Amino acid sequence: MSDTDGKKTLGLRGGSRTGQVKQSFSHGRTKNVVVETKRKRVLVPKPGASASGGRGSDPKKPGNATDAEMERRLRALRAAKANESEEAERRAAEEKAREEERARRRAEIEAKEREEQEREERARQKAEEEEEARKKAEADASSKPAAARSKADDPATMDPAAAQAAEARGAGKTGSGPRKERTADRAQPRKEQKGKGDDRRRSGKLTLNQALSGDGGRQKSMAAMKRKQERERRKAMGGSQEREKIVRDVQLPETIVVQELANRMAERVADVVKALMKMGMMVTQNQSIDADTAELIIEEFGHKVVRVSDADVEDVIATVEDDPADMQPRPPVITVMGHVDHGKTSLLDAIRNAKVVAGEAGGITQHIGAYQVTTDDGTKLSFLDTPGHAAFTSMRARGAQVTDIVVLVVAADDAVMPQTIEAINHAKAAKVPMIVAINKIDRPEANPDKVRTDLLQHEVIVEKLSGDVQDVEVSAINGTGLDQLLESIALQAEILELKANPDRAAEGAVIEAQLDVGRGPVATVLVQKGTLRRGDIFVVGEQWGKVRALINDQGERVDEAGPSVPVEVLGLNGTPEAGDVLNVVETEAQAREIAEYRESAAKEKRAAAGAATTLEQLMAKAKSDETVAELPIVVKADVQGSAEAIVQTMEKIGNEEVRVRVLHSGVGAITESDIGLAEASGAPVFGFNVRANAPARNAAQQKGVEIRYYSIIYDLVDDVKAAASGLLSAEVRENFIGYAEIREVFKVSGVGKVAGCLVTDGIARRSAGVRLLRDNVVIHEGTLKTLKRFKDEVKEVQSGQECGMAFENYDDIRPGDVIEIFEREEVERNLE
């Protein structure tokens, strides 16, 4: 007997059965869908279970429980029952409310359906009434034919087949009403199916019945459903609620693109463009608008405007107000001014040689123009030397802006000169105290009193004439009066009480700048505030840099320079201009940004100054350029100040007929690029204290470009004036050489009319020009065709002699007319 007799094989029976269903879509599309049918497990209580084992039975008291414990348990049980009853009541109330809501909605739907059916019924009845009225009108219009037709169609008289056909036609005509009803009945389930589809999409599940229904057409997306629910929720909460407006601080530059403006306000670009169009501006999102228009738009959208400018990059330059407690005494800065050849440089050299240790290594460079000396009592003085020629007026003005005391040098044998007056005006404009140094008193022709008297004409009253301006008689050659001059300067400095804060970011002024071979751009800086140290990052004018080295006036490298100390600064990326302000900043990025902004601003300013703004100005400029001859030149100098001074002088040379145009001015040696520029424009190259390198010399020789070297600005100016004078047209002058009176007029064959004349004054020449005067009015000007004495052709006739004259191409001559004889000569002109 087997173990498996009467037993079934043990196995797992699947809880569900799978199958495939073909689902139909619109436009004839189908899809096979896998579905499964699950059987629901039903839980049935066991038959042996006691019906009285519920919570309602009295609990049995445990053997080890006390009365208090039992009391607590009973109270807890009663509380649980009470909560349970309350929960049941609440659930019943909620269920009742839900049922009422469902009933209300069903009532609304039924009311809408009834209203729709009534409307359709009224429309159907109206259509039937119109149809009956139309038929009645047709019947009245054709009563006789209708009567005949009705008689012929009478069922009593027609055969059975015709009666059936007529009955079928009548049924076809009267079947419109039931067909509409069937259409309405068929449309109603379609609405219900659509609602069912919405439920299916909302649930996200596909059942067997839904798959078999074949209703798989295009339906709304879940996002659309959610938007609809959100709108219904807002409507149920009391209408559309406006979202709270967020007010933003919008940074507004000088110009801004429309799209960027919309992004900063967090508004739609279309709304911003629409607002601009309302203001009359037809712009797109990629166009720029000015700050004023953008401000109106920002205020219209309810935001706040924060104006920013490109110049805000310079805000990083600290404008710190120094605390009086941090201020310390500083050396005075003395600027030596005066007329050329009055001994300014000689006086400074004498002071320096007298106060600087002999045998000093190095010494000041040729163009540093600033240095310090120490007096016998230990007082330090910083001197600035400004050139005396009139071309350096701008440099001298910049020197007066950084100076504390002006020493006006006047030669005792030359008195007050034009540039002395300029120096006085600069000192007065800068409101700087002045000390007069009367130099060259060692010469026999020296007259210091005349100098003091001449200064009175310019409101400079010295102490010897009961004024408040100190005057010292000195001699740079003999060294006379130098100590007294230094004492006067120190006394004036004590009166001024000069102080500065050394413990802050450095600020200074560029006295001179040059491009040095091997060292690059070098600037002589006079520190005015703070302390300049090695490694500091700074910006100066349109240039920036990092202090690579500091060199004092004695040629020594130093680590720092305090207030009123002149030093050479190495480490610039370009050559600044004399007078630019140096400021120390924190980072290299800030310095670069400030320098780039200043450079772009300077370019815009130059472009605006050089460009004609109207058509009339352009035409006038073009017309003037046609009549004005230009002398193009290229200027290279050793230092920036010299190049600037030469350019300013060149701009002043010329008149309404000729002018000098500086094609390029720079600092450093003459290079091949300078030669190429000069060759393209036909200009000479002028070098001031610089030379051309070997490639530049070879290029100039090959291209025929002239290079001239100068070390004195007078010679350069004179040569340029002479060259410009060569472009001037020569001046034509007339010299009257004689007068002749016509006594008789003769007609000569082959010649025409010939005037018999008497030379009354001067001389008559055959080659001279003549004018015919009648009643002292010029009626003809020309030349002589013939000049004869008796029958001979002669070159000239002296005064008191008679002669015959015939005019070239002119015969209207009468007795009594006067002939004026003159000669023309050309005189070369010079520029003053």
Swiss-Prot record:
Pfam families linked to this entry: EF-G_D2, GTP_EFTU, IF-2, IF2_assoc, IF2_N
Bias type Low complexity, positions: 142-171
Bias (Basic and acidic residues) ranges: 81-141, 178-201, 227-244
Alphabetical UniProt keywords: Cytoplasm, GTP-binding, Initiation factor, Nucleotide-binding, Protein biosynthesis
A GO molecular function held by the record: translation initiation factor activity
Biased composition (Polar residues): 18-27
Cellular-component GO terms for this entry: cytosol
Renumbered residue ranges of the record's region G5: 475-477
Record InterPro entries: EF-G-like_DII, IF2_assoc_dom_bac, IF2_II, IF2_N, P-loop_NTPase, Small_GTP-bd, T_Tr_GTP-bd_dom, TF_IF2_bacterial-like
Region annotation G3: where it falls in the sequence: 385-388
Region of interest called G1, as start-end residue ranges on this chain: 338-345
Region (Disordered): 1-244
Region ranges (G2): 363-367
Residue ranges occupied by any tr-type G domain in the UniProt entry: 329-497
SUPFAM superfamilies cross-referenced by the UniProt entry: Initiation factor IF2/eIF5b, domain 3, P-loop containing nucleoside triphosphate hydrolases, Translation proteins
Residues reported to bind GTP: 338-345, 385-389, 439-442
Region (G4): 439-442
UniProt subcellular location: Cytoplasm
Family of this protein: Belongs to the TRAFAC class translation factor GTPase superfamily. Classic translation factor GTPase family. IF-2 subfamily.
Protein's job: One of the essential components for the initiation of protein synthesis. Protects formylmethionyl-tRNA from spontaneous hydrolysis and promotes its binding to the 30S ribosomal subunits. Also involved in the hydrolysis of GTP during the formation of the 70S ribosomal complex.
Name of the protein this chain belongs to: Translation initiation factor IF-2
Native species: Dinoroseobacter shibae (strain DSM 16493 / NCIMB 14021 / DFL 12)
Gene name of the record: infB
